[in-house]
UniProtKB/Swiss-Prot annotation:
Belongs to the alanine racemase family. The keyword Isomerase applies. GO terms for biological process: D-alanine biosynthetic process. Substrate binds at residues 118, 295. It comes from Aliarcobacter butzleri (strain RM4018). GO terms for molecular function: alanine racemase activity; pyridoxal phosphate binding. Pfam families: Ala_racemase_C, Ala_racemase_N. Its EC number is 5.1.1.1. Gene3D superfamilies: Alanine racemase, Lyase, Ornithine Decarboxylase, Chain A, domain 1. Pathway: Amino-acid biosynthesis; D-alanine biosynthesis; D-alanine from L-alanine: step 1/1. It comes from the Bacteria. This is Alanine racemase. Keywords: Isomerase, Pyridoxal phosphate. It catalyses: L-alanine = D-alanine.
Length: 340
């Protein structure tokens, strides 16, 4: 059956590069949302702990529960239903209206909208948020924001950095006024970290770089990272097609000579985005995908028992006119994973 192989060596290499840029392992929070960008939540969390990472970021409480014993600190980004809670969980407050929904005595990181206009409270509402949380005995353990264009060549990155600097000053003044401890500050995602000279925040939230990718790395002279994931498929059947015969739905690939063709057990049902006559892809070993990708299989000009479908998703991202994130996160979470 199809299988995802996860390279421990490559993951550790990436985490080492990230940790050195951040200043230490303690200043790195590995982002594990959406099944660790398709790589496997528990698998990547276990390896990150082994490397020495103590902070993680997930999407929901249910995700946090699966890795609760692996980290000292888990930031939950988008939870609305608090059926359980742990002292290691820190809940993102995305709007003022959510203050009344938070568990009593919980830890909260206030998200501030510094320009992305997606989630977070406005800077002018910070004191209102602190007072509302204080009334409910909820501890503000962090304040953060998210960059909308750190991986793009524009001034947005510097504009948002300046906005967050003003937020930090405001928060410090509020905490002094209310006799509260200064919370942790964090804003840098993968691209923002590597565009920041002399990183000085409390920690960085690193997602895609953990898994070996930094989009537009050539533009910013980012470090070369190593992809962690490779997707492998097993042979289902083999046949010899005569010259002029066609393969798959629609018969969009026709042989120009007698050809050996095998089907392999990966398809768009596994989250491998559909290829067709307008989207041509060749595997790392040089086998071209023939015709249309089906729900459960695809065809190649080989009879190898196992074939590496990809070990770097950047080429597929170009073919599908998308980003590396989408290629990995759309993979079916039920695909077997093996750490190598």
């Amino acid at each position: 059956m199809a299988k995802i192989l996860l390279s421990k060596e490559n993951l550790f290499y990436n985490l080492d590069v990230i940790s050195k840029k951040a200043g230490s392992k303690e200043k790195v929070a590995v982002v594990l949302k959406d099944n660790a960008y398709g790589h496997g939540l528990v698998e990547i969390a276990t390896l990150a702990k082994e490397f020495g990472i103590k902070k993680a970021v997930v999407r929901t409480i249910d995700d946090a529960l699966k890795i609760e014993k692996l980290f000292d600190f888990i930031l939950v980004l988008a939870e609305k239903s608090f059926h359980t809670y742990s002292h290691t969980f820190h809940i993102a407050l995305n709007s003022l209206e959510d203050i009344d929904k938070l568990p009593n005595n919980s830890n909260v990181h206030i998200k501030v909208d510094t320009g992305m206009h997606r989630n977070g409270i406005y800077p002018e509402d910070l004191e209102k948020a602190f007072l509302g949380l204080l009334e409910r005995n909820i501890k503000v353990t962090g304040v953060f924001t998210h960059h909308r264009g750190a991986d793009e060549l524009s001034t947005d990155f510097f504009w948002q950095k300046e906005n967050f600097s003003l937020v930090k000053k405001s928060v410090k003044n509020i905490c002094e006024k209310l006799f509260l401890p200064i919370p942790l500050f964090h804003s840098c995602n993968s691209a923002a970290l590597f565009r920041t000279e002399n990183f000085d925040e409390d920690f960085t939230r690193v997602g895609i770089a953990t898994y070996g990718y930094l989009d537009d790395s050539d533009v910013f002279n980012f470090p070369k990272l190593k992809p962690v994931m490779s997707l492998w498929a097993s042979r289902l059947s083999t046949r010899i097609l005569k010259k002029g015969q066609s393969v798959g739905y629609g018969g969009t690939f026709t042989t120009t000579e007698d050809m050996l063709v095998s089907t392999y057990d990966v398809g768009y049902g596994d989250g491998f985005l559909r290829l067709n006559e307008r989207k041509s892809y060749t595997t790392p070993k040089g086998y071209k995908v023939l015709g249309r990708v089906s729900m459960d299989n695809l065809s190649l000009n080989t009879d190898d028992e196992k074939v590496c479908i990809f070990d770097d998703v950047r080429e597929l991202a170009k073919i599908h006119d998308t980003i590396t994130y989408e290629i990995t996160t759309t993979l079916n979470p039920n695909i077997e994973k093996e750490i190598i």
